[in-house]
Amino acid sequence: MSKLTETFTNIFKIQELRERLFFTTLLLIIVRIGSHITVPGVDAVLLADTIKKSSENTLFGLYDLFVGGAFSHAAIFALGIMPYISASIVIQLLGAVVPYFAKLQKEGEEGRKKITQYTRYGTVAISLMQATGVVAKLMSTTTSGIPIVPEAVRGFGFYLSTTIILTTGTMFMMWLGEQITERGIGNGISLIIFIGIVARFPNALLDEFQLVRGGTRNLIVELVILVLMGFIVAGVVLITQGTRRIPVQYAKRVVGRKVYGGVTQYIPLRVNTAGVMPIIFAQSIMFVPQIIFSFFPNSEFMNELSTNWFGYSSWTYSFVYALMIIFFTYFYTAIAFNPKDVADNMKKQGGFIPGIRPGTHTSEFVDNILTKITLPGSIALAAIAILPTMMIKMGVTPGFASFFGGTSLLIVVGVALDTLQQVESHLLMRHYDGFMKSGKLRGRR
């Protein structure tokens, strides 16, 4: 404990680190304030009541969970940062199939600037599309027969202004994220998502203890649930950090009077190379049917499909969701990690895996190991993703159940590890002790 206290004390001794932390905190506070500023014309009380009654099993409930509660407040940041994430994914996928984008990814700083610009354009386009869908859903939603958008303000003016406000809100959040990345600590976009998720935890925990106070749940059962949550978080940390290391030997080279090489290094292959991306891919696709159903609010057939077949708590949803996560884990791993490039770079630098011939044989060896460790990683990822649904079926409140797994827990754990790793790097660079004695706290990368 004294070690941890000393580390936090050291953080505030470094002026640059102190300023970066203050700047990051300030911008995250702005994000939270924007998540509570209501869009003009929407009855936020009725909207929050609608989402609460839905038990987070509808499109509204799922979306609100992902944007940190901004949607339930009908806030200007209701779209969250997800349009930017979606645009980034699309650009990354284009880099794997379109030569122009593949070339940009290899052009260093200039290529990165162009990719960033294309990502911004994509964010605007996706934000506009999502905003129009959200406004349409808002205008068609009622609570006890009362519309959440009053008749007096409905019309093209409301539709256009709200679409612009929501799109602008996302672009402003994107700018805040970029500022945090450049002038603060950690990845700004990730931290914005992180703070939105964590901000919901106190209320979710309070809802759980309200059940205990009301006599609905036994205190011992609640304590067991909390202990179980601790084990699940520990398991997610292990999966996030789990690595298979492949030894690489470098031949000795004599340059002048100096001898280079002759050392053993390692290729770290993560059990979960794809990170949270497979869940985001699968979740995005599973949202599509719900979006389609939302345009037919009066159709009994569509409502039946939406609730019993594609509803968040249905077994069909969980089964299809898990299969898609396993598929996308392999798919994204193949895009994010290229064994051939690793083998070629190793060969150029005079490195080799003991017992394996350089070149094609090395590529096949690495690919074989990656395929083997990806299977348990993908199954574990699918299990983590559907855990919240299972916990809801066991009686845990929907808000608290979201912290048992899924995208929320993976993002919280991953971003926390990455940010702590950056803080530790600043400490070690200035000869202070880090969070761990070995100074080897690893992020996700």
Please report, for each region that a protein language model flagged, where it lies by residue:
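N-terminal cationic and glycine-rich segments that engage phosphates or anionic surfaces
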Residues: 1-105, 109-445
